[in-house]
Amino acid sequence: MVFSFPRNDREFVENVVFTFDKDGKISDVSFALARKSAEDIASHTNWPEEARIILMNFLESYKTAYALKRLDYISSIFDEDALIITGRVLKPAGKVNEFGAGKYVSFTRQSKSEYIKRLSNVFRSQEFINIQFTDCDVTKLGKAPGLYGIKLRQEYFSSSYSDTGYLFILVDLHNPDTPVIHVRTWQEEPDKNFGIIGPYDF
């Protein structure tokens, strides 16, 4: 599907995934992961096929919820005590050189309620939001079923702002119908000492 916007010349192409229930009826529609991200998850052949499908479905639902501004869904998947760190690249007037000098990155730790309130404002003010995932690295945590740490390179686009950075999501998928995110962090680049924030940094 091709998406275009009357007040912006940006255009997005999304492959669509249909989920069917046991009666063969469509129960859900979402935007597909990029092929590389899907292949990264599928490469864990030592995991049950069902687990890999659940992970893909979760990430597809996650990116689709932001594109469709589904604040209700996003609110439902974050734990009430979730650790949420957001970031924003600030570019002052003037040219940013090839080494990135002249730009600054602001980080904010937020509670779930603060994050959802801010996201609500973003959704209202933006004509569109689109996120794309690449470089998907998934770790199964402990012996508890369904607990995963997911590292992703994220490209974020909206009508007035865009950036590229790295997400870490700690999510409980033991019940696929009600995923629970316990940690969500963002950083612009991997740290030179410890790389991308991961499950063992908490």
What is each stretch, according to the model?
Residues M1-F31, W186, D191-N193, G198-F202:
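Amphipathic, hydrophobic N-terminal targeting peptides for secretion and organelle import
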Residues K63-A67, D79, L83, S120-F128:
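Sec-exported extracytoplasmic/periplasmic mature domains
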Residues K69-G94:
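Short, well-ordered alpha-helical segments enriched in acidic and aromatic residues
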